[in-house]
């Protein structure tokens, strides 16, 4: 899943370590989310979106080719 977590985190002047502490996860989890190697739980995704003050669908961009209408 693509996301803009890294850009938003940096715009707030937060290190991965500090942001991870705020979200109560490891720095490695934040790194994996930012690189698209790990999809956060719904609870964590909402916590991240609340921290950034934006809607979840603007921060996490889900695209599944199987859902594309193939008319």
Predicted feature descriptions by range:
Residues 50, 60-71:
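Short, charged recognition helix plus adjacent turn
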Residues 18, 29, 58:
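Residues in the helix-turn-helix
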Residues 25-38:
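Recognition helix of helix-turn-helix/homeodomain-like DNA-binding domains
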Residues 3-22:
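Short basic helix-loop element that most often maps to the first helix and adjoining turn
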Residues 37-47, 66:
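Short, basic-rich loop-to-helix N-cap that marks the start of a DNA-contacting helix
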Residues 43-58:
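DNA major-groove recognition helix of helix-turn-helix/homeodomain DNA-binding modules
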């Amino acid at each position: 899943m693509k996301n803009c977590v890294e850009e938003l985190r940096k715009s707030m002047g937060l290190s991965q370590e500090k942001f991870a502490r705020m979200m109560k996860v490891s720095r490695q989890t934040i790194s994996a989310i930012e690189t698209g190697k790990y999809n956060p739980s719904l609870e964590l995704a909402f916590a991240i979106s609340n921290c950034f003050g934006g809607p979840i669908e603007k921060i996490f961009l889900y695209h599944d080719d199987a859902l594309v209408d193939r008319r």
